[in-house]
């Protein structure tokens, strides 16, 4: 819709222009400031606006008016009717764009495969999945990936933790736990399964600790995949750090060719300070063992070899200091580091009845993703975790998301969608019955509600471009509020313009359903 409006304006202005959306839709749907033309045309902005406004008299798309140096535009009824009819005839493809050339690889979650996903992972999981869904809707080629950190000390520690749990809780032995270890019911469950498969001996043979750890890792990954599937998240590619380590030597050699590596006290460094890092970073320790950074460099080299146009990593905010060293390494590998975008997720605080949410016994000392999903439902989880900008911390009370009133945003939006279905039922009509109703009879309030429903594609484009996904739930809350207000103030069924108003409502319902679908939520027809 906006593109058609811009094309119409461009035919008259014949130059670049800015198209704004005034806050007050009663003034205009769109507006263009003309102050920059005053010097070029040697006229006042008000006179320029007035002269241009006259040139839109024959437009079938917009009505133009001059206001204080602005060209104000309102969409004509016949254009609103045309757009609305197209949407209702093909509602499944509303806000769905043709294929674009740009491709993206989005990596998110990438939690250690040593335990179930907890609250610290949920925000990135929901954000990443929603960003991928949104990008696909907008026509981008999107692939998703989970990087499995399965080559570090944490995997050895997983095996040790399983052995200790087995000795203490299966065989009633007294054990001494290290300062750091994995605990929780899931560790005991893995120990029981290992005992059934391998027998008791595996817990006492240190040479088999890695075998035990790999067994545990595979089970944890299945738990992670199930927890994600339960909230509608399905990641396409799972990249193992361990499997990539064959690429260590060729990747190091590639880095050396950049002349940005050096040896110091037996260790191998990259000169990341040359590209803005605080310190140069060790890639290979003096005992020959690669660092955590080395694993990430190998992984990103493998990523960039896939030749996507853009790479997006979604990390916790505590990884902020890691960005410069990784981007430096990507540059030294010969790639454009600006093709990598890192999006950081701020902390989440979860409350229940105003108090901190109880930790899960199954995870030892964490609030599990599966617990939250069970408590409030997968769809409420998906909604609330992108309801605020990722750059801000998020705090919410699970009890608020169980309320069936306007204080619960997902209920309020769903109620709007269900209410529209109820209104159609009350009128005894379907969308096909009203699709040819015209909009000439509509007043400004009706047209403003319709316009708000029609701008969803603009909201989606903006949300993807800015990476501010909270703009989608914000839009839905606003649209639902506008609909409820309009319906509470106007008689629809029995109105002389009933069919036209029902047609407006049908478009509102399509917008809600479409936006919810991108968020991984199913709009309710009944409540």
Swiss-Prot record:
What Pfam families does its record include?
Arg_tRNA_synt_N (PF03485), DALR_1 (PF05746), tRNA-synt_1d (PF00750)
Q: What class of enzyme is it?
A: ligase
Keywords in alphabetical order? Aminoacyl-tRNA synthetase, ATP-binding, Cytoplasm, Ligase, Nucleotide-binding, Protein biosynthesis
Q: Where in the cell is it found?
A: Cytoplasm
PROSITE patterns recorded for this chain? AA_TRNA_LIGASE_I
- InterPro entries membership: aa-tRNA-synth_I_CS (IPR001412), Arg-tRNA-ligase (IPR001278), Arg-tRNA-synth_N (IPR005148), Arg-tRNA-synth_N_sf (IPR036695), ArgRS_core (IPR035684), DALR_anticod-bd (IPR008909), Rossmann-like_a/b/a_fold (IPR014729), tRNAsynth_Ia_anticodon-bd (IPR009080)
GO function terms (MF aspect): arginine-tRNA ligase activity; ATP binding
- What is the first-listed, main subcellular location in coarse terms? cytoplasm
Under CDD domains, the record lists: ArgRS_core (cd00671)
Motif 'HIGH' region: list the residue ranges.
111-121
The EC number(s) given in the record are: 6.1.1.19
> Which GO CC terms are listed, alphabetically?
cytoplasm
Q: Name one GO biological process term.
A: arginyl-tRNA aminoacylation
- Give the reaction(s) catalysed: tRNA(Arg) + L-arginine + ATP = L-arginyl-tRNA(Arg) + AMP + diphosphate
The keyword Ligase is assigned to this record: yes
Q: Does the keyword Lipid biosynthesis apply?
A: no
What family is it from? Belongs to the class-I aminoacyl-tRNA synthetase family.
On subunit structure and binding partners, the annotation says: Monomer.
Q: Which NCBIfam families does its entry note?
A: argS (TIGR00456)
Q: What is this protein called?
A: Arginine--tRNA ligase
What species was this sequence derived from?
Campylobacter concisus (strain 13826)
The lineage, from the top, is: Bacteria, Pseudomonadati, Campylobacterota, Epsilonproteobacteria, Campylobacterales
């Amino acid at each position: 819709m906006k593109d058609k409006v811009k094309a119409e304006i461009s035919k008259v202005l014949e130059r670049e222009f800015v198209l704004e959306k005034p806050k007050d839709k009663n003034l205009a749907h769109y507006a263009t400031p003309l102050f920059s033309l005053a010097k070029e045309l040697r006229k006042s902005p008000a006179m320029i606006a007035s002269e241009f406004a006259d040139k839109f008299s024959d437009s079938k798309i917009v009505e133009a008016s001059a206001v204080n140096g602005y060209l104000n535009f309102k969409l004509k009824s016949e254009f609103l009717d045309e757009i609305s009819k197209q949407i209702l005839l093909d509602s499944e493809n509303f806000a769905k764009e043709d294929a674009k050339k740009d491709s993206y690889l989005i990596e998110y979650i990438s939690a250690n495969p040593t335990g179930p996903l907890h609250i610290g992972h949920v925000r990135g999981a929901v954000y990443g999945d929603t960003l991928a869904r949104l990008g696909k809707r907008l026509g981008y080629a999107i692939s998703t990936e989970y990087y499995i950190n399965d080559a570090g000390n944490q995997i050895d520690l997983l095996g040790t933790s399983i052995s200790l749990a087995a000795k203490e809780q299966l065989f009633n032995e007294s054990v001494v736990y290290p300062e750091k270890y994995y605990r929780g019911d899931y560790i005991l469950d893995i120990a029981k399964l290992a005992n059934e498969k391998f027998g008791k001996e595996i817990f006492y043979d240190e040479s088999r600790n890695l075998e035990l750890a790999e067994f545990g890792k595979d089970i944890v990954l299945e738990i992670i995949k199930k927890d994600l599937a339960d909230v509608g998240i399905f990641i396409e590619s799972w990249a193992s750090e361990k499997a990539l380590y064959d690429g260590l030597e060729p990747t190091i050699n590639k880095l050396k060719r950049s002349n940005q590596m050096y040896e110091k006290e037996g260790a191998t460094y990259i000169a990341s300070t040359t590209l803005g890092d605080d310190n140069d970073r060790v890639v290979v320790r003096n005992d020959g063992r690669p660092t955590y950074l080395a694993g990430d460099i190998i992984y990103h080299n493998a990523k960039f070899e896939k030749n996507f146009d853009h790479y997006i990593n979604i990390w916790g905010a505590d990884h902020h200091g890691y960005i410069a060293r990784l981007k430096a390494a990507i540059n030294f590998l010969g790639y454009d580091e600006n093709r990598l975008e890192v999006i950081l997720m701020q902390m989440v605080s979860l409350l229940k009845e105003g108090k901190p949410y109880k930790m899960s016994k199954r995870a030892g000392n964490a609030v599990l993703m599966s617990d939250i999903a069970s408590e409030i439902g997968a769809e409420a989880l998906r909604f609330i975790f992108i309801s605020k900008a990722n750059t801000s911390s998020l705090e919410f009370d699970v009890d608020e998301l169980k309320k069936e009133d306007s204080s619960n945003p997902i209920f309020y939006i769903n109620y709007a969608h269900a209410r529209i279905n109820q209104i159609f039922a009350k009128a005894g009509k379907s969308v096909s019955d009203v699709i040819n109703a015209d909009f000439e009879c509509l007043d400004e309030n009706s047209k403003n509600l319709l316009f708000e429903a029609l701008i969803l594609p603009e909201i989606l484009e903006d949300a993807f471009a800015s990476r501010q996904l909270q703009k989608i739930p914000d839009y839905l809350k606003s649209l639902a509020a506008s609909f409820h207000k309009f319906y509470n103030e106007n008689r629809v069924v029995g109105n002389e313009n009933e069919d036209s108003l029902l047609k407006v409502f049908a478009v509102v319902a399509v917008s809600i359903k479409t936006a919810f679908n991108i968020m991984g939520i199913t709009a309710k027809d009944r409540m």
